[in-house]
Regions:
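A residue-level marker of the well-folded mature domains of exported/periplasmic proteins
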Residues: 1-165
Length: 165
């Protein structure tokens, strides 16, 4: 968001809310409804079933939501801009290959991202439009080739955000 604000020359305000649940859709709907009534244009949920309520609130408010885990546009084709995909199949394939190569995989933590094609955004993007989609894909490329390194924690984010000013 900070990167987009700088690129667009706009002030974008982020309002983070926590549902303290991954399954309570009614809580997600209540939080998103309040955010929309307070002037929020887009709500990005990252909380499993809670997000179903967020998407329902977006439909009712005629606003936008960003889905998570898989392409959730089918839930509200006029309201889900895009989704943050977790391509678990790719992670399973990578770990399986290590196991098949005889490497010890137990007791390890694996972190996969864009470089491993384990996360991304859906190719379908009619609500985003071609220009926004192509800009996002270009940023994915910059992350993959390490031209841009996304911050991994609050301290890195604060430093990154300061560098954008």
């Amino acid at each position: 968001v900070a990167y987009a604000a700088k690129e667009l020359g706009k002030k974008i305000t982020v309002d983070a809310q926590y549902a303290e649940s991954f399954s309570d859709a009614s809580k997600g709907k209540a939080i998103a409804t309040k955010m929309f009534s307070n002037g929020c244009d887009v709500v990005f949920h990252a909380a499993g079933g809670v997000g179903m309520g967020v998407i329902e609130a977006a439909k009712e408010a005629n606003k936008y939501a960003i889905g998570v885990d898989r392409d959730q546009a089918y839930l509200a084709p006029k309201n889900v801009l895009t989704s943050a995909l977790k391509l678990v199949n790719q992670a399973v394939e990578l770990v399986s290959k290590e196991a098949m190569d005889g490497k010890e995989i137990g007791g390890k933590t694996y972190t996969y991202g864009l470089s491993e094609n384990a996360v991304g955004i859906p190719e379908e993007h009619k609500l985003m439009g071609d220009a926004t989609y192509n800009a996002a894909v270009a940023l994915e490329g910059k992350i993959k080739d390490k031209t841009i390194t996304p911050p991994a924690n609050k301290a890195e984010f604060a430093k990154y955000e300061a560098s954008l000013k």
